[in-house]
A protein has these predicted regions:
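Intrinsically disordered, low-complexity segments
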Residues: 16, 71-72, 85
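Extracellular/periplasmic metallocenter environments
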Residues: 7, 75-128
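Hydrophobic beta-strand residues in large extracellular and virion-surface proteins
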Residues: 4-8, 15-17, 41, 56, ...
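Residues that cap or initiate secondary-structure elements
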Residues: 12-14, 49, 94
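Beta-strand cores of secreted/periplasmic/IMS beta-sandwich domains, seen most often
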Residues: 31-49
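N-terminal edge beta-strand
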Residues: 2-37
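Predominantly extracellular/luminal cell-surface or secreted proteins
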Residues: 18, 46, 59-61, 110-112
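Short, surface-exposed alpha-helix to beta-strand junction/turn motifs within ectodomains of secreted
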Residues: 50, 54-72
């Protein structure tokens, strides 16, 4: 099982992400490229522009049969008390959605020299 890391930073008045910690994009819509069932997905603060991630709430997505289903066997949770890294595991349930449907999630984080901020991007379901 692999680990996919999404690096987060606050720049230009918006939340930005990178999968290589080099090239950053505004977080609007993205795919967790290469995620397979059982893979761990980690969100981590790339620099001190974000003091901490307060929480990451993930939604459910629809299966081909039209039922709502979690794509996470372990929902994103803080890995330690600093709350600078969150980790979740992609479901291995064979009934989990495997088509590129959309799964909404919300990131609430605290910026340096500022308050709490919410970002509600749309993320594509990890592809098996």
């Amino acid at each position: 099982m692999a680990t996919i890391t999404i690096y987060l930073k606050y720049s230009g008045g918006d939340l930005q992400y990178s999968t290589d910690n080099v090239t950053y994009h505004d977080m609007t819509e993205t795919s967790i490229v290469g995620a397979n069932p059982g893979d761990t997905v980690m969100w981590t603060c790339a620099d001190d522009s974000i003091d901490k991630i307060n929480n990451i709430n993930v939604g459910k997505t629809k299966t081909a049969g039209g039922n709502w289903k979690d794509i996470w066997s372990s929902k994103p949770a803080a890995t330690d008390n600093t709350k600078r890294t969150y980790s979740g595991v992609v479901s291995t349930d064979p009934e989990s959605p495997t088509n590129p449907a959309l799964n909404g999630y919300d990131i609430n984080y605290k910026i340096k020299n500022g308050g709490n901020v919410d970002k509600d991007p749309t993320i594509q379901v990890p592809q098996p």
